[in-house]
Regions:
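Membrane helix-loop-helix hairpins that form the core translocation module of multi-pass transporters
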Residues: 1, 16-17, 51-112
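Juxtamembrane transmembrane-helix termini in multi-pass membrane transport proteins
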Residues: 16-62, 66
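Alpha-helical membrane-inserting segments
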Residues: 26, 30, 63, 67-79, ...
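Interfacial segments of multi-pass membrane proteins
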Residues: 41-46, 137, 155-167, 176-182
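Juxtamembrane boundary at the C-terminal end of a transmembrane helix
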Residues: 201-207
């Protein structure tokens, strides 16, 4: 019986991971587009070869987010099994949601967040200093950038556990925030403002 239950849980995990991957791909597409565009231009490769090279860059980027999606799915299953999230729901209980917001708020002020955001704001600088040639060069650069992107946005995306994993409006807001942090002239100020907002939200949920 235990083995059967474990197997069933494993079957359910992958649709959940694919759901998270689809959400991450959709939400990060606006922020990823400037990088994909600049990679294609900077590569200087035209025609079908250029499309193929750009596709490898995008594939590396998506692979990084697939890893995040699997981790998020495992975390959601853990929340459901520990009763921190109702099995039929998509949002953490208030106390756990408060912890998520507090962690996300604190991370907005972390040096790692600032470093990853600086990377995400300078695609041309990255390509000038870290360019890799060869068939797998684009893929490796895409994967590398994807890891930086996760370092910048993982806590933002984790707030979905507190608001609602299937909350379309919150997902749209997160996509807009991720893009604004990257391209807005005062993106670093926005980072700090969001940190304060998340901390206040976490404290309010604890009351």
């Amino acid at each position: 019986m235990a083995a059967h239950t474990h197997a069933a849980s494993g079957v359910e995990l992958w649709p959940l991971a694919l759901m998270w991957f689809g959400m991450m791909a959709a939400m990060m597409a606006p922020a990823a587009w400037p990088w994909v565009r600049d990679f294609h231009r900077f590569s200087g490769i035209s025609g079908s070869d250029g499309v193929e090279a750009t596709a490898r860059f995008a594939s590396g980027y998506l692979l990084a987010w697939l890893g995040y999606a699997i981790g998020a799915a495992l975390l959601q299953r853990g929340f459901q099994q520990s009763a921190l999230m109702p099995a039929s729901g998509d949002r953490l209980v208030a106390g756990a949601g408060a912890v998520i917001f507090l962690l996300a708020g604190l991370y907005q002020f972390a040096p790692l967040k600032r470093a990853c955001l600086t990377h995400c704001r300078t695609p041309i600088g990255y390509f000038l200093t870290r360019w890799r040639n060869g068939p797998m060069g684009g893929f490796r650069m895409g994967l590398h950038h994807g890891l930086f992107c996760i370092g910048c946005c993982w806590a933002l995306m984790a707030t979905a556990f507190a608001v609602g994993v299937m909350n379309v409006w919150w997902m749209a807001a997160l996509a807009a925030i991720a893009l604004a942090e990257q391209i807005a002239p005062h993106g670093d100020r926005l980072r700090r403002i969001l940190g304060g907002v998340f901390l206040v939200a976490g404290l309010l949920l604890m009351i």
